[in-house]
UniProtKB/Swiss-Prot annotation:
Assembly: Homodimer.
Catalytic activity as recorded in UniProt: Hydrolysis of Ala-|-Gly bond in repressor LexA
Official protein name in the record: LexA repressor
Keywords carried by this UniProt record: Autocatalytic cleavage, DNA damage, DNA repair, DNA replication, DNA-binding, Hydrolase, Repressor, SOS response, Transcription, Transcription regulation
Residues flagged as site, Cleavage: 90-91
One example GO MF annotation: serine-type endopeptidase activity
InterPro entries, per the entry: LexA, LexA-like, LexA/Signal_pep-like_sf, LexA_DNA-bd_dom, LexA_repressor, Peptidase_S24_LexA, Peptidase_S24_S26A/B/C, WH-like_DNA-bd_sf
GO biological process per UniProt: DNA repair; DNA replication; negative regulation of DNA-templated transcription; proteolysis; SOS response
Amino acid sequence: MKPLTARQQEVFDLIKAKIDDTGMPPTRAEIARELGFRSANAAEEHLKALARKQVIEIIPGASRGIRILLQDADHHDEELGVPLIGQVAAGEPILAQEHVESHYKVDPGMFKPQADFLLRVNGESMKDIGIMDGDLLAVHKTQDVRDGQVVVARVDDDVTVKRLERKGSMVFLHAENEEFSPIEVDLTSQSLSIEGLAVGVIRSTTWM
C-alpha cells in the first residue's frame, strides 16, 4: 500500500477520531470545516485518494458513507478494534479482508484467551448455552482445541459453531439445542478445519 501524504493522513486521522468520539464518520462538509478546505468537494477528492490507497471504503449515497478498512496505512489492527466477520466465501481464509464487515472497540484481553475476531451468529443451534441468533461470538484463532470445547469449524466450505467431539476418523459437531442433530464428519472423505475457539459472547443489542 502506498504511503499517505501528510494531508491524507490528517483526513484519515479526523475520520478515525470522529468514529471513536461519536460512533459515526464525519460528513464531507464537516471534514472541510475541520481541516480548512474551501469546499466539501475538496474533502471528497481526499476521500477518493484514501479509497484508492485502500485505507477507507466510500459507501455511495450516504453523507457519512465512510468505512475504515482493517488494513489502514500505519495504524495497527488493534487500534481499530476487533474485526467482525460476516459471510465467509467458500475456500477463502476466515480473516480475509473481504469478510470483514466492520470492527468493534472492545478490549481483546477481556476474553481468555484473547479474542482475535468476532463472528456473527446465524441461527439457534447453540441457544441452550446462551449463544443466540444475531449475537457476536468472540473467537480466539487457534487449531489447538480439545474435545468438549465450542469451536468455529469449517466443514468442506461451510463455517459452523458447535461443540467438538472426536472419535478416530470421525468428528461430531454437537449443537446445544435438542432440535438439531450433530454434524458428522468422516475425515477419510470430508475436509474439516478448526478456525478458532469460542471465548465469549457479546449480545448484539448492546453493540448494534
